[in-house]
Amino acid sequence: MKALLILGLLLFSVAVQGKVFERCELARSLKRFGMDNFRGISLANWMCLARWESNYNTQATNYNAGDQSTDYGIFQINSHWWCNDGKTPGAVNACHLPCGALLQDDITQAVACAKRVVSDPQGIRAWVAWRSHCQNQDLTSYIQGCGV
């Protein structure tokens, strides 16, 4: 009985953690989703963004006390502008999806919403982590050895 309880707890912790992509696994996935040079943004830029926003974790969330919004998923897409979490005051939901959809292991909806974000005039500069860690940097290491 004790062994079953421990096994159950281990399985629960894995389910809650979500998918953490390996670097090259994510690079290949993003390439398949057409992210390389989408709106002129290189695959290496997307990889750098995902690394600094979520460390490649689909379940990452971060609460922003200032505007009471939350950033969701592998790209840390914000609930004030892009998705609906049912609790962010004045949410716009420009991607027309529930924020929980951005936390799925299948990143199809997260990619579609990220494409929507960069279609706005601010582009990839909408992400603070990209401006702080990726802009004007050599990003080759993010895709090196991945065959993409």
Swiss-Prot record:
Membrane-spanning intervals of the chain: none
Pfam families: Lys (PF00062)
Domain C-type lysozyme: residue ranges: 19-148
Tissue specificity statement from the Swiss-Prot or TrEMBL entry: Expressed in blood cells.
Disulfides per UniProt: C24-C146, C48-C134, C83-C99, C95-C113
EC number(s) from the headed UniProt entry: 3.2.1.17
Active site: E53, D71
Enzyme class: hydrolase
Catalytic activity, as annotated: Hydrolysis of (1->4)-beta-linkages between N-acetylmuramic acid and N-acetyl-D-glucosamine residues in a peptidoglycan and between N-acetyl-D-glucosamine residues in chitodextrins
GO MF annotations in UniProt: lysozyme activity
Keyword Glycoprotein applies: no
Organism: Bos taurus
Protein task: Lysozymes have primarily a bacteriolytic function; those in tissues and body fluids are associated with the monocyte-macrophage system and enhance the activity of immunoagents.
Similarity section: Belongs to the glycosyl hydrolase 22 family.
SMART domains (UniProt xref): LYZ1
A biological process term (GO) from this entry: defense response to Gram-positive bacterium
Gene3D superfamilies: 1.10.530.10
Signal peptide residue numbers: 1-18
Protein name in UniProt: Lysozyme C, non-stomach isozyme
PANTHER family: LYSOZYME C (PTHR11407:SF28)
Keywords, ordered alphabetically: Antimicrobial, Bacteriolytic enzyme, Disulfide bond, Glycosidase, Hydrolase, Signal
